[in-house]
Swiss-Prot record:
This is Pyridoxal 5'-phosphate synthase subunit PdxS. Catalyzes the formation of pyridoxal 5'-phosphate from ribose 5-phosphate (RBP), glyceraldehyde 3-phosphate (G3P) and ammonia. The ammonia is provided by the PdxT subunit. Can also use ribulose 5-phosphate and dihydroxyacetone phosphate as substrates, resulting from enzyme-catalyzed isomerization of RBP and G3P, respectively. The active site is at K84. One of its GO terms (molecular function) is pyridoxal 5'-phosphate synthase (glutamine hydrolysing) activity.
Length: 297
């Protein structure tokens, strides 16, 4: 599928990101998985060489995927293909744009390349998605040009608790702004370490200026539906599908649950007979230094 023409205009990039609302974006490591994801109803796939669970288990430095691998997935499906670049690694982003990916994830799942600076996303035609654990972090990424935000969660664990915490935090901070007087927003902007203009926008609109999706630890249809009920615009699923016992059926079930997140009968029906979910890791058992969501600022 050919890449979108965005002309580096923030509004156009955000408009392109709107197409993913209400949908599921799935991590895939080869063309076969990409085709499974497309057949299951995924709105996009994330091409990477190792899913987060394997990155976590194998350790070492994790970088952008091989261009040949990304090309194979681009050729295999007709839905948009995303790919990850390291935080701050603008040359990896340049390469991904050259390859024709439709979205770049400046991702904490990969080993950060720069501990002081994120990528200047306005310098690219391709839109970016970035992770956030709170509203200030989300607005700083938007100020750098991100066209989509995802609450981080804790990737590769199968434990949805951090995804819940981050989504609730962002939503609560948004709600707090909506009740503030205009003069209080100056103080809020300082506290959030975010531009005043973006803080005012959130206060007036009651939402981010870009779509807010969720990620990290989503492993079941019920997980996906819960995150949608908590206010997510869509769902990223990483290890939860292809580290499970029946990836094809689980992928379809998570898509159905995301689309019908307020329908317990549908969620119950699609949750039957899925086989074993990924084994997972309790986030509380992870040392702070091993928590991927801590990356970024």
């Amino acid at each position: 599928m050919s890449a979108p023409t965005t002309n580096a205009a923030p509004r156009a990039k955000t408009g392109y990101a709107d197409r993913f609302k209400g949908g599921v974006i799935m991590d895939v490591v080869n063309p076969e998985q990409a085709r499974i994801a497309e057949a299951a109803g995924a709105v996009a796939v994330m091409a990477l060489e190792r899913v987060p669970a394997d990155i976590r288990a194998q350790g070492g430095v994790s970088r952008m995927s091989d261009p040949d691998m990304i090309d194979g997935i681009l050729e295999a499906v007709d839905i948009p293909v995303m790919a990850k670049a390291r935080i701050g690694h603008f040359v990896e982003a340049q390469v991904l744009q050259s390859l024709g990916v439709h979205f770049i994830d400046e991702s904490e799942v990969l080993t950060p390349a720069d501990y002081a600076n994120h990528i200047d996303k306005f310098a690219f035609e391709v839109p970016f998605v970035c992770g956030a654990t709170n509203l200030g972090e989300a607005l700083r990424r938007v100020n750098e040009g991100a066209a989509m935000i995802r609450s981080k969660g804790e990737a590769g664990t199968g434990d949805v608790s951090n995804a819940v915490t981050h989504m609730r935090t962002i939503r609560a901070e948004i709600n707090r702004l909506t009740s503030m007087a205009e003069d209080e927003l100056y103080v809020a902007a300082k506290e959030l370490q975010a531009p005043y203009e973006l803080v005012v926008h959130v206060a007036r609109e009651g939402k981010l200026p870009v779509p807010l999706l969720t990620a990290g630890g989503i492993a079941t249809p019920a997980d996906a539906a819960m995150m949608m009920q908590l206010g997510a615009d869509g769902v990223f699923v990483g290890s939860g599908i292809f580290k499970s016992g029946n990836p094809e059926q689980r992928a379809r079930a998570i898509v159905a649950a995301t689309q019908n997140y307020n329908d317990p009968d549908t969620i119950a029906r699609v949750s039957r007979g899925l086989g074993e979910a990924m084994v997972g890791i309790n986030v509380d058992d992870l040392p702070v230094s091993h928590r991927l969501a801590e990356r970024g600022w």
